[in-house]
Amino acid sequence: MIDEARPLLVFFFSERSGPARRMESLLAHLARKERERMRLRRIDVDLRPDLAERFRVAEVPTLVLVKERRVAARLDGRVSSPRIEAMLEQHLPALEPAAA
């Protein structure tokens, strides 16, 4: 699959945000688990306020799922793994069965 075809999960965070720091390991695990179906990018809002403004980030952490160059879904604030996975399942391509 072409890299650009996979949906992109953008994690807006700040080093100063405790809730965002606590989500780091959860997202790292999720990125490894779903690496065939999505990409993950981290954006520090303190270093890239332009992107935070463009995506209308009002709080950190914020997750924005970009699919086909459009925002498909978002979760604002600290959220649990089940909520993130539920959001992703609605938008990620189905896993292809492994060859026998």
Task: Locate the predicted segments by residue.
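Typically the conserved alpha-helix immediately C-terminal to a functionally engaged Cys/Sec
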Residues: 19-34
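Short active-site neighborhood of thiol/selenol oxidoreductases, capturing the structured segment around
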Residues: 3-16
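Receiver (REC) domain active-site loop signature in two-component systems and cognate sites
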Residues: 14-17, 57, 69
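Hydrophobic beta-strand anchors of alpha/beta hydrolase catalytic cores
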Residues: 9-10, 40, 63
